[in-house]
Amino acid sequence: GPTPVWNASSLKGTQYPVPGAASEPKSVQAWDDFVTAVVGRYAGQITAYQIWNEASLKMFWQGSPEQMADLTERAYRIIKDKDPSALVVGASTTVRLLGAFERFFPAYVEELAARDWPVDALAVHSYPSGAQGPLDRARNLRLVRHTLDRLDAPDLPVWDTELNYGLAGPGDVPRGEIVGDQATSWVARTHLDSMRFGVGRTYFYIWTPEPYE
């Protein structure tokens, strides 16, 4: 993702970053062609492909979990054919908005199971709210693990492909600033919690303070 305007099934709803960007593709063949072109160009250079960004949020994905699982399976087949050593990581889901998480993630996992697990890893974004810290992130990871256990999912790797602290929201929660010794201790705590909850990879977004340029 995102979906280009010309291949969007709908231009309604979110306009980020362009109209139709969160829409399911009108032509899945165009999706196949896109994946084929990317993997053909970067085979041997890109070692892992995440299928979609934050598909649990309507601003990034307005299709269904079933449709996202279909895109995942199609991409998996192409990637494994063109570059068998590359890893396929499922569409990421945020956790801090519980309603969005519950609406997307369990159904997506069930749809992946129905397709015989066309992923090498699952992806979450474990941001807590702007006023919360590592303990709250750990609760988010515990929820992910509980959900996977409840659905009797296999022992697939879980990657935290985007997280940080102080991100504004949800709602009117302002952004926070974590610096100095607090930042140092939170980074250490974060990686220890990742180990504790079996999170194989942890990616901070991003390390620099605002402005990002």
Regions found by a protein language model. Give the residues of each.
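Surface-exposed amphipathic alpha-helices with a cationic face
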Residues: T72-D83, N140-A153
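Active-site metal-binding loops of divalent metal-dependent hydrolases
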Residues: A55, E162-L163
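Short, solvent-exposed loop/turn segments at secondary-structure boundaries
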Residues: F60-P65, Q132-D136, I178-V179
